[in-house]
Amino acid sequence: MLDHDVRSYELIARAFVGEPGGLSRDDVLDNVTHYWLTNTAISAARLYWESKLAFFDAKGVEIPVGVTVFPDELYPAPLSWAERAYPKLIHYNKVEQGGHFAAWEQPQIFSTEMRSTFRSLR
C-alpha cells in the first residue's frame, strides 16, 4: 500500500508525469483501487501502527538476514544499524531503484538480491 509520506508522494508524482521510477500510472491506480474496493487499507496499515515503536529495536533475530536498501524505501537502513539489529547479517547492499514494495516495483532487482543473500546458505 502506498503510504502517506513524502517518498510515496514523490513516487506517485513521477509515475503520473511519465518519469521512470518503478511504478506506472496503472500500477498506482491498481494499488489504490485494490484497497478502495476491498475496503482493506486500514487493516493493511495496522501492522505499521502496531509495530511503530519496535521497528528500530530489533532483538532476538537469530537467523541469517539479508538487507537490501532501496532508494525510495520509507527508511533506508544504514549498515551500522543493520549490523546491530541483525547479528547474523550475511548480505547488505544498496541498489539504485525501488522502494517499499520492491518485489512489485523492481522484480528483477528483488529476485537478484534474494539470490545473492541466500547463495551462501546452499
Language-model segments: residues:
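C-terminal subdomain of alpha/beta-hydrolase-fold enzymes, centered on the catalytic histidine
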Residues: M1-R122
